[in-house]
Amino acid sequence: MTADGKIVIVGGGPVGSLAALYASHYHDNVEVYELRDERQNPAGASPLLQKSINFTLSERGIRALEKSGRTDLLRAIMRTAIPMHGRMVHGRMVHGRSVSGKLQETFHQYDVHGNSLYSLDRKALNIALRQELDATPNVKMFFHHKLIRADMNTRKVWFEQREDPSTSTSPSTSSTPKEVPFDFLIGADGAHSTTRQQIMRYTPLDYQQQYADTVWCELRIPPTEKTNSFRLPPNYLHIWPGGEYMFCAFPCPDQSFNCILFAPASRLDALKSSPPATLFDFFDTHFPGVCPDLISQSSLSQQFYQSPHLPLIGIKCSPHHLGSAAVIIGDAAHAMFPFYGQGLNAGMEDVRILFDLLDEHRVFGHGKSLDKDHARAAALTEYSNQRVRDAHAIHDLSRRNYLELRGGVNSPVYKARKFVEEALQRYVPLLGWRTLYSRVSFSDQRYSEVVVKNELQGWVLLLMSGLGVLLHVLVFGALGGAFLGLKR
């Protein structure tokens, strides 16, 4: 550890908290500043701050937690996690071109080798991480602090201090911002990152922000009343694909399901201004079996009309750092649509890779500050060069996966390619063949490399199918010629 300077982390969500745990191994002066305290439920919080879509934990996130060296933390997190072995796709049976009223479920396994994803409660994960930080003496956490300005030259940041709404009937803001010096600033303050905005004042930073033509609404399937148990098999991500609509259900530790309705904003706005009967018809048409079987009409009506309908935002930027002074990680650097379940995992992987590179460049081993700055600048440059490409790759994959989830999972082309690739992965492992989903979720291959390998596999399959067609033509042509020769 070094005593000089201070590592300041803006944002105390899962990514910022994990960064603080990593930093605590190298530095004895780490401070985390967070706007809200999720151990409480502040009154009047913005709907954006109250979001509770379940996290999906996969190999990348698990490896980052393991690398933190906090085995008890990982065990505590995994105790509350629910394994999901695949997707359970719901709908009505199709006979030819007609759709019957009979409900059906189709299981799509995630991985031929039995790997699973894990459904995590957002608040439980945050609490587990913050309890670990509370037990780490060289990390200090400051809640109700909002970053308002940064001077990257003098390495100082200023925070607006807000009163704790749980202890005050009329929360107010302090008139004098709190000044905090830093040696190294890590921004993990989400999609609307102030750290990123401040970095843009000091360096050219390419920035792209895109809203999807889809909004989301959170709903809940409660446990059964008599036995307080799951209403659906718990070890699956349940999906009702509906063309331009989609309904997903994630299992929760309290035997409920956290559900997300995705739909075009115009459609949800129209439903919100319509009578409940229209809402019930909409669910019966697009998500059969949900209402009233899983959610009663009264509960669905209450939840839908009272829950906020929130936008989906995707962000790309480059670079992710400023000299030796600052870096942004997680959603601050690469907010993505939630359709690959990689937002949390990519953010945690950011932390692992960032500190691996800082370690490789011996940033924390340099005694002189000038040498340390040069080493950290080199490490951060390498970090940006690597993570920008990977962040852009998973951002694009996440957007593309939405099209697959809301309808493509039932397409013959999707099923055929999945069947062939899984067969090659299972029976000819020496080829190194894997499905795109398996590479993304059950490996730590760079996202950009995953895309390249998947495209190569696509070309190989296309070539194989073309050769197959050509072979059929040649065989049948030869047989036809032989037959005509015999007739003569």
Curated annotation (Swiss-Prot):
GO BP annotations, alphabetical order = 'de novo' NAD biosynthetic process from L-tryptophan; anthranilate metabolic process; kynurenine metabolic process; L-tryptophan catabolic process; quinolinate biosynthetic process
Task: Give the Gene3D superfamilies listed for this entry.
Answer: FAD/NAD(P)-binding domain
Q: What is its main location?
A: mitochondrion
Q: Which reaction does it catalyse?
A: L-kynurenine + NADPH + O2 + H(+) = 3-hydroxy-L-kynurenine + NADP(+) + H2O
E.C. number(s) listed in UniProt: 1.14.13.9
Highest taxon, organism lineage: Eukaryota
One Pfam family here? FAD_binding_3
InterPro entries from the UniProt entry: FAD-bd, FAD/NAD-bd_sf, Kynurenine_monooxygenase
Give the transmembrane region(s): none
Name the top EC class: oxidoreductase
Pathway-wise, it operates in: Cofactor biosynthesis; NAD(+) biosynthesis; quinolinate from L-kynurenine: step 1/3
The protein's GO terms of the molecular function aspect are: FAD binding; kynurenine 3-monooxygenase activity
The entry's keywords? FAD, Flavoprotein, Membrane, Mitochondrion, Mitochondrion outer membrane, Monooxygenase, NADP, Oxidoreductase, Pyridine nucleotide biosynthesis
User: Where found in the cell?
Assistant: Mitochondrion outer membrane
Q: Which cofactor does it need?
A: FAD
Q: Which GO terms describe its cellular component?
A: mitochondrial outer membrane
Q: Which family does it belong to?
A: Belongs to the aromatic-ring hydroxylase family. KMO subfamily.
Q: HAMAP family, per this entry?
A: Kynurenine_monooxygenase (MF_01971)
Per the entry, what this protein does is: Catalyzes the hydroxylation of L-kynurenine (L-Kyn) to form 3-hydroxy-L-kynurenine (L-3OHKyn). Required for synthesis of quinolinic acid.
Name of this chain's protein: Kynurenine 3-monooxygenase 2
- Lineage, opening ranks: Eukaryota, Fungi, Dikarya, Ascomycota, Pezizomycotina
Q: Which gene encodes it?
A: bna4-2
